[in-house]
């Protein structure tokens, strides 16, 4: 009985845990490439390494699709285009722990984000360990991303554009940018889901198509 309880709990979170673990693994590879190439965590190098790794992983997904039985291909393609159909409170419970941990890690470092927005050199003058804080923030973002992708698939545009729109509305202070991005991003996703469910009803578009 003692061993069965943890197994039961872990079993429900398997997909989310695997997604977070591989998200962290991807982050480690990006950081490794960045350190090997420049020796420092510059934003430009991190972005470039992320693009390179994203292309490589996309090729692996394409290979898996090619090797998948024909009857299962549609399910994989639908997931890669992102979908929240048939998702309910059960999935919310699965990602909630990852949401709390990742959000707390990022919100707690809003001051550091404000300092880094002025430039890494300026942030270092304040006595901040830029490299360490950047790693913590990236880990928090990986936890959030892994938990979300495990449930809905990769939904583009929202995480890329919404924070910039919020910054235009509330200013550059991350104390406000982060929570408002959370709220407005969620509202935008709900609106996109409504459009995806109604525009070609009774069929449904993948939500990733609408957001993009």
Q: Predicted regions: what is each one?
A:
Residues 1-212:
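Alpha-helical transmembrane segments in inner-membrane proteins
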